[in-house]
Amino acid sequence: MGFPLEKSEDEWKKELGPEKYRIMRQKGTEHPGAGRFTHQFPKQGVFVCAACKELLYKASTKFESHCGWPAFFDNLPGKVKRIEDNSYGMHRVEAVCANCGGHLGHIFKGEGYSNPTDERHCINSASLEFHNEATNDN
């Protein structure tokens, strides 16, 4: 599956380091509650892809889901690609960066959260970086 930014797996390994590589390129996950952004709720700013720095989520879309991972109810338009994921005998929707294809987490719908989209983007902290202000240097 092609993405605008493509690199070899060796390049990703060098750039990301072992833990981010495991999560972002091998579709791993963090332990619940272990991520640095799980309990942080900035009022403004943006979350970007840890691999390619593409803008992904506005801080204003982050909410407390009590699931153990950062949760967002919507991504910036066109920035997160949804891919059907039937691994481990489950039907889920994988969230990946639309620019580099890095694994972010999964998207769930209809869980009863009172947010504008009725979605929970359950995202690994290791897949994100936070910027206090919106930037155009992605």
Curated annotation (Swiss-Prot):
The keyword Oxidoreductase applies. GO terms for molecular function: metal ion binding; peptide-methionine (R)-S-oxide reductase activity. GO terms for biological process: cellular detoxification; cellular response to oxidative stress; protein repair. Its main location: cytoplasm. InterPro entries: Met_Sox_Rdtase_MsrB, Met_Sox_Rdtase_MsrB_dom, Mss4-like_sf. PROSITE patterns: MSRB (PS51790). Keywords: Cytoplasm, Metal-binding, Nucleus, Oxidoreductase, Zinc. GO terms for cellular component: cytoplasm; cytosol; nucleus. The keyword tRNA-binding does not apply. It is found in: Cytoplasm; Nucleus. Binds 1 zinc ion per subunit. Its cofactor is Zn(2+). Transmembrane segments: none annotated. Belongs to the MsrB Met sulfoxide reductase family. PANTHER family: PEPTIDE METHIONINE SULFOXIDE REDUCTASE 2 (PTHR46081:SF8). This is Uncharacterized protein C216.04c. It comes from Schizosaccharomyces pombe (strain 972 / ATCC 24843).
